[in-house]
Design a protein with these regions (language model features):
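Short beta-strand segments within Ig-like beta-sandwich modules, predominantly Fibronectin type-III
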Residues: 48-55, 139-146
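Solvent-exposed loop segments of extracellular immunoglobulin-like
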Residues: 29-36
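Histidine-/acidic-rich catalytic cores in large beta-rich domains
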Residues: 94-113, 118-129, 161, 167-593
Length: 593
């Protein structure tokens, strides 16, 4: 077997240029070929950026720094497992020719690339930008003394002129660099945005911080054209300041735009254009929408098979990058069980969940499966099922209908213990799992919920417990406060007419007690979707993702004050998986929140 590798443009190219690599392989043996692409800068070691896939094309946008890179491709015959490896050099040069910064347009009309001269090692740099009314800044990058400093500038209004300058920080002193200007472009026609309406404007008590709202909006399921709205960031007036153009495709209907990552990147689970199936890829993108790294369900399953684990059928709901550079991902698993399981009169297909810890090269390092650690006969209380065509379910491969047993919908890494907090929507439970930074047993350490290990104290509510909850997270960098969106399906099934709630729980893990610090009724019943977040000012943001679900569905972002009253409210004419309030597109929370 031999393999060749060709770039779309000749070297050298400037920082921020997209280079498309095409691999061409030949093999005298029959069999399907797939390809893995890796990149190395200097002698820092290769990092896999696109794991084995039948696609022989790799798009690479080196936006951080110039240097002498090595691009490596491995071609593999899936029948014989024979491989062929080729490594080629490619030079990336700085955009900065002298002592002045350079501001360049990108392929995204609302994102610029700011390039500053190298700065002394031990110092750091960030960029401020303003349109004269609204100001913000990038994250802070460390200087290395020899390479230019490059920043994506995002969170900008369309067709607007901004003034920018870098700030050099050395010890306790800061020095402003020269100013420059950049004018954003217009948003192209045809981009599918939801319509935003502000019900209650932001007031001083709820607009001092986190004045950006990042929304993962699905299309309206009543009048759907199977085309999702693009993930969109707006200000608190509903004006667009960023969007991800990569979702402008019917293939991504029902896919997940997961979460922002500190520094200005984003995690998502898009469809696979090779198969047409949704939720088949894990992808990290930069602010301009370029893919940084990617792997697939197919590649994950190749590794799970070698580990003796069940295959997965689709990524969903959540992912998180860990302090050690690993990434938690989750996916659905499917298994057929004999008659009698969960009360079935015939063999029954059951959907469970799998958590995987991927190392820096996106290789599976640790696996947790609900089928291994949970009681298969603890059936979900509302007898929910998935079909192969349900947009809120993964693709099914074993049967046309499956019991939707667990429906895990959030992951929350716990820095103090290295464990994971997970939400099982269809079980009305929250679990703490022994992860121990990738060497844990996987055992369930405790269960929080109506039938769990904790006693609810101090509440007169006839049904204080959450059900079918979303976005369960510890707050304040600790383990004593949990926020969540209580959809309330089980409670409302038994008490028609009630509504979803925003909840904040005080939890004592040593005494196994929990109390309600906040239990606020939402404007209606959202049977799915939703998020919860403590804001820097002490208020809480709740996203009721699917209100008025039977007629004219919409999502509503609500800021709740500590006394339970509503502040800022914004609605969009979509169903919204999650909503994040952010200081900037580079930072979700202020330190200590």
């Amino acid at each position: 077997m031999t393999v060749q590798l060709s770039p779309s443009v000749a070297q050298p190219q400037m920082v921020g240029t997209t280079i498309t690599w095409t691999a061409t392989a030949s093999d005298t043996n029959s069999g399907t070929l797939d390809f893995q692409f890796s990149v190395e800068l200097a002698t820092n070691g290769f990092q896999v950026l696109q794991d084995y896939d039948v696609s022989n094309v790799f798009s690479w946008t080196p936006y951080a720094q110039e240097g002498k890179y090595q691009i490596q491709v491995i071609a593999r015959n899936l029948t014989t497992l024979q491989t062929s490896t080729l490594t080629v050099p490619f030079a990336i040069k700085s955009r900065v020719a002298g002592s002045s910064p350079v501001i360049s347009a990108t392929n995204h009309p609302l994102v610029a690339l700011y390039s500053a001269p190298a700065c002394p090692s031990g110092s750091s740099m960030y960029v401020t930008f303003t349109n004269g009314t609204v100001s913000n800044q990038t994250g802070v990058n460390a200087c290395n003394g020899s390479h230019s400093m490059n920043f994506y500038i995002g969170g900008l209004y369309p067709s607007t002129t901004y003034t920018l300058n870098y700030v050099l920080v050395t010890g306790s002193s800061s020095t402003n660099g020269p100013t420059g200007q950049f004018t954003t472009g217009p948003i192209p026609t045809g981009v599918p945005f939801p319509v935003m309406s502000v019900l209650v404007p932001a007031a001083p008590q709820d607009a001092l911080t986190q004045s950006i709202l990042l929304l993962d909006c699905y299309s309206n399921p009543v009048n759907t054209n199977n085309l999702d709205f693009v993930p969109t960031a707006v200000d608190l007036n509903g004006q667009v300041i960023w969007y991800y153009p990569g979702y402008d495709s019917s293939l991504n209907y029902g896919s997940y735009f997961i979460r922002p990552v500190p520094g200005g990147t984003f995690l998502l689970y898009p469809a696979d254009e090779n198969t047409g199936l949704r939720q088949q890829l894990f992808r990290q993108i930069d602010m301009a929408g370029n893919t940084i790294r990617q792997t697939s369900i197919t590649r994950i399953n190749q590794q799970l098979a070698l580990l003796g684990q069940l295959p997965v059928v689709g990524f969903n709901h959540d992912s998180e990058i860990l302090p050690n550079g690993h990434t938690l991902v989750k996916a659905s698993q499917e298994e057929v069980f004999p008659a009698g399981t969960q009360g079935a009169t015939a063999p029954v297909d059951i959907l469970g969940d799998c958590i995987m810890d991927l190392d820096k090269n996106m290789q599976v390092d640790w696996v947790w499966s609900a089928f291994t650690y949970l009681n298969i006969n603890q059936k979900d209380p509302l007898n929910e099922t998935c079909t192969a065509t349900s947009v809120d379910c993964p693709p099914l491969v074993l049967a046309p209908v499956a019991n939707d047993w667990t429906h895990m919908n959030s992951l929350n890494y716990i820095p103090s213990s290295g464990d994971i907090l997970v939400s099982l929507r269809n079980q009305d439970e929250v679990l703490k799992i022994d992860f121990n930074n990738g060497v844990g047993t996987g055992d369930v350490l405790w269960t929080l919920g109506k039938k769990g290990n904790f006693t609810m104290t101090g509440s007169t509510d006839p049904w204080p417990w959450f059900s079918h909850q979303h976005d369960v997270n510890y707050e304040l960098n600790g383990t004593s406060v949990i926020s969540l969106f209580d959809n309330g399906n089980t409670r409302i099934y038994k008490n028609p007419g009630e509504v979803s709630r925003g909840q904040v729980l005080n939890i004592d893990e040593s005494a196994f007690t929990v109390s309600l610090a906040m239990n606020v009724n939402m404007p209606g019943f959202s049977p799915a979707l939703g998020s919860a977040q403590r804001l820097d000012n002490g208020n809480y943001h709740f996203e009721a993702g699917w209100l008025d679900y039977t007629s004219s569905p919409y999502g509503e972002a609500i800021e709740v004050l500590p006394n339970g009253t509503f502040g800022f409210e914004l609605i969009d004419n979509s169903v919204t998986y999650r909503g994040y309030r952010m200081d900037s597109l580079y930072e979700l929370d202020a330190p200590g929140n």
